[in-house]
Design a protein with these regions (language model features):
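HDAC/HDAC-like amidohydrolase catalytic core signature
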Residues: 1-176
Length: 176
């Protein structure tokens, strides 16, 4: 059975700005390194491109008023009151395409979960995922939409049990 490599160039739309510590070009560098080592063309690998997660799926965890703010911020300008939702200068800046990019990342985690759950892949690697600090009503720790929670809930809705093992340097507080 194959390993699914979930990849999209749309992840490059996450542009936190030149002074932000999270540099999303690392995703492109990672992909090019995987290509250089031949990992993306191995017979046991399959490259899968995600679709944006449907808003109704994102709304299964995130509050409607928070999603309204994310959508309003998609043009690159923070709407009035955005700071109440964790948006603004610092950890979670507003940038053009914020909502669109967050939906693609969430879609990648949902795709990875579904490929494994359905038996179409033995494992899946979604290296843009794991934005585990977003809360139902606010962004936190560079995370706008909690793709980990969405994938876990997707699997649980199918009656599957999930063990979430987080090996990040700090606590994935949006998942608890």
């Amino acid at each position: 059975m194959k390993t699914a490599l979930v990849h999209s160039d749309a992840w490059q739309r996450f542009d936190y700005g030149p002074e932000h510590p999270l540099r999303m070009e690392r995703l492109g560098l990672t992909w090019r390194l995987m290509e250089a080592y031949g990992l993306t063309t191995l017979p046991q690998a399959t490259v899968q491109a995600p679709e944006p997660a449907p808003e109704r799926v994102i709304a299964s965890y995130h509050a409607p008023e928070y999603l309204d703010v994310l959508k309003a911020a998609n043009g690159g300008v923070a709407p009035r009151g955005a700071e109440r939702y964790g948006l603004g200068p610092g950890d979670n800046p507003v940038f053009p395409g914020l909502w669109d990019a967050a939906r693609v990342v969430a879609g990648g985690s949902l795709l990875a979960a579904e490929l494994v759950a359905s038996g179409h892949a033995a494992r899946a690697f979604h290296f843009a995922g794991g934005l585990h600090h977003a809360f139902p009503t606010r962004a936190s720790g560079f995370c706008y939409v909690n793709d980990a929670v969405l994938a876990i809930r997707h699997l649980q809705a199918q009656g599957l049990r999930v063990a979430y093992v987080d090996i990040d340097a700090h606590h994935g507080d949006g998942v608890q």
